[in-house]
Amino acid sequence: ASLPLIPRRGYDALMTGMLTVGTAVGVWRGGGVNTRIIRDSAADPAMLEPPEGHPEAQIRRAAPPESLADLCADIDELYWAATTGAVIKICRVGTGGARRWLVSMVGTESMRFGSTHNPADIEVNIRLMLGLDSAMGVGLVAALHRAMAADSVPEEQWSSEPVLVCGHSQGGLVASVLASRDPAEAGVNVVGILSTGAPNRRVAVRPDVTIVTVAHDQDVVPSMDGSPDRSPDRRVTVGRTLVRPRKRPLYYAHSSATYTETVRLMERRAAVTPWDRLGKAVAALRAMLPAPGEEARVTHHEIWQDLLEPTAVSTWNTVASLERADPRAVTYPIDYEGARPISATARGIGAAW
């Protein structure tokens, strides 16, 4: 086997090189992806046994969300769950034909340049930028399927159940990649996305998906996808200029807690002008939330990955035959004259901002 052509676009070439070289030298060792329900509001007691060898999750926000800001506030807590893997919150709302699913999803939790049992790491970021399957994407789909199975939803309906994902940073990117694919291919039907601080401008979602992206002017992370500040689809983009804090301004700008407050302000603004694009988009997302008195079931899921062990056999051929990226990044010809689609990039290593 031979290495595929290096993409001509510099950013894609950088990501391809990081994934290829990192895998070759054993930095990226993500393997099989595992999920387990660790809390179920329908169980007694609600807290379930954690995976063997894992600490019990620290969970306090177990009620169904009543607003979009609640979805974001749930993410604030999930970052502090203190588990081995990443924790996401899934809420089933309604029954029968009115049934829908709400997901709160964290962003990057491990900033180490190397794989850990927590798949919300840099490898996932790189693979998502190249349009490849990632551990968190696989884990989210598996967790949703597990929640649907626990709720006795027939397997043939899993890919058609409507899902709203609220994702911070990497979580918003994972949701966008899934929403760019046909539901039958993705395994889930993402119909709504609220992304906060996510570098997802290079991914165009399906036309039937309602997506609101929130980005602070001082937050550098949304610009880390190598794409200009433009909308590749019909998304509604919300910005906010922050007052500089006394310390740690970059952390403050990207903090999930800061975005929770911004989303709360956004909902108030949308309530005042419900007729404009933002008002209509927010109304569409809020329609997924539980109505007063509507039945809901909340489950928390831990997602973790196995780590591949080095072998004595050369893995060069595995690294050299990486898969074609799909979906491909959005190209803006005015900014990248002479650019062409990625011909071939990375495939096939691991299961997996």
Spans of model-derived segments:
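Gly/Ala-rich beta-loop-alpha elbow adjacent to hydrolase catalytic centers
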Residues: C166-A179
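Alpha/beta hydrolase fold serine-hydrolase catalytic domain that processes acyl esters and thioesters
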Residues: A1-E161, P183-W353
